[in-house]
Amino acid sequence: MDEEIAALVVDNGSGMCKAGFAGDDAPRAVFPSIVGRPRHQGVMVGMGQKDSYVGDEAQSKRGILTLKYPIEHGIVTNWDDMEKIWHHTFYNELRVAPEEHPVLLTEAPLNPKANREKMTQIMFETFNTPAMYVAIQAVLSLYASGRTTGIVMDSGDGVTHTVPIYEGYALPHAILRLDLAGRDLTDYLMKILTERGYSFTTTAEREIVRDIKEKLCYVALDFEQEMGTAASSSSLEKSYELPDGQVITIGNERFRCPEALFQPSFLGMESCGIHETTFNSIMKCDVDIRKDLYANTVLSGGTTMYPGIADRMQKEITSLAPSTMKIKIIAPPERKYSVWIGGSILASLSTFQQMWISKQEYDESGPSIVHRKCF
């Protein structure tokens, strides 16, 4: 596709926004889904201080800002801020005029209907896009892995879903949602580091802890055994340098943090872990397709990037499933962006072109058109 008329693909995650052009193999812009507002009144006259900052700029000025995430648990909760993020995406990151390109947006499975209507309305009325479409994130991840049947365990910053998909259609009755994801793990790491005597409290310091989590955490194959190793030797300890030069050491926190994915009771939650949720999702499906789901379990999203997570999933699901069942966990290396990549593939298919909701259709039917055209 020509870049002149290429569709724009925007994957709005709770933690990061991924945006770019359909047909590309990776998003051009990846920035935090945050809007920051100054905590203090400006004293320097003529400094040209803005009333809000978006993305990386908010991140770099985080010391003087209050940071807010407009998407919580995968669902947009603050539309004014969301509009700022989209504006920033089009005009500052991609540097395109949205009125010249069709836009493919993504949404969480089981998203409230009003949510996708509002997205549709903003695209057509605020940004005047010629056409748009809303696709379900997990389905796009499956496309990106080159499959049309499988179960996707998609875990990002705000929410985790297990979505069984058969021949390209998500099976809504079997989708399970777990409000436990990256942000909760960051908060948990903040808590267990506090027990070590390090204090992280502000929204800005939370970002430092997120970095520690991404660089040093991993999933243990056998949690109890790993705890034993950590207690008896210092082989698992790693050090991390804080922005002020102070060095902190972390040991069993490295695997205690993501262990909460398998044991949500660590966070005081009563829900099942990701392995059991995946299994329960499969069990809600027709008995004839379960075999295909077990053999095509695809991991997607940033929270599945921990080293060791695929082996642990394999071990846990094997112990839950029938003993003769072949179980395969697929963890594509680019899974952090697989939702975006799937969107890029979908929006550049010739067969998809008649699926777009056009401005004309929107003007005739209103926002509810999105339920008829996007499934």
UniProtKB/Swiss-Prot annotation:
UniProt function note: Actin is a highly conserved protein that polymerizes to produce filaments that form cross-linked networks in the cytoplasm of cells. Actin exists in both monomeric (G-actin) and polymeric (F-actin) forms, both forms playing key functions, such as cell motility and contraction. In addition to their role in the cytoplasmic cytoskeleton, G- and F-actin also localize in the nucleus, and regulate gene transcription and motility and repair of damaged DNA.
GO molecular function: ATP binding; hydrolase activity; structural constituent of postsynaptic actin cytoskeleton
Lineage: Eukaryota, Metazoa, Chordata, Craniata, Vertebrata
One Pfam family hit: Actin
Modified residues (N-acetylmethionine): M1
Name the record gives this protein: Actin, cytoplasmic 1
Tele-methylhistidine PTM sites in chain numbering: H73
Any further remark recorded for this protein: In vertebrates 3 main groups of actin isoforms, alpha, beta and gamma have been identified. The alpha actins are found in muscle tissues and are a major constituent of the contractile apparatus. The beta and gamma actins coexist in most cell types as components of the cytoskeleton and as mediators of internal cell motility.
Keyword Hydrolase tagged: yes
Catalytic activity reported: ATP + H2O = ADP + phosphate + H(+)
PTM section of the record: Oxidation of Met-44 and Met-47 by MICALs (mical1, mical2 or mical3) to form methionine sulfoxide promotes actin filament depolymerization. Mical1 and mical2 produce the (R)-S-oxide form. The (R)-S-oxide form is reverted by msrb1 and msrb2, which promote actin repolymerization.
UniProt keyword terms in alphabetical order: Acetylation, ATP-binding, Cytoplasm, Cytoskeleton, Hydrolase, Methylation, Nucleotide-binding, Nucleus, Oxidation
Family stated for the protein in its record: Belongs to the actin family.
Enzyme Commission number, as recorded: 3.6.4.-
Cellular component, GO, one term: actin cytoskeleton
Subcellular location: Cytoplasm, Cytoskeleton; Nucleus
Expression sites by tissue: Skeletal muscle, heart, gill, digestive tissue and brain. Widespread expression throughout the brain, with highest levels in regions where neuronal proliferation is greatest.
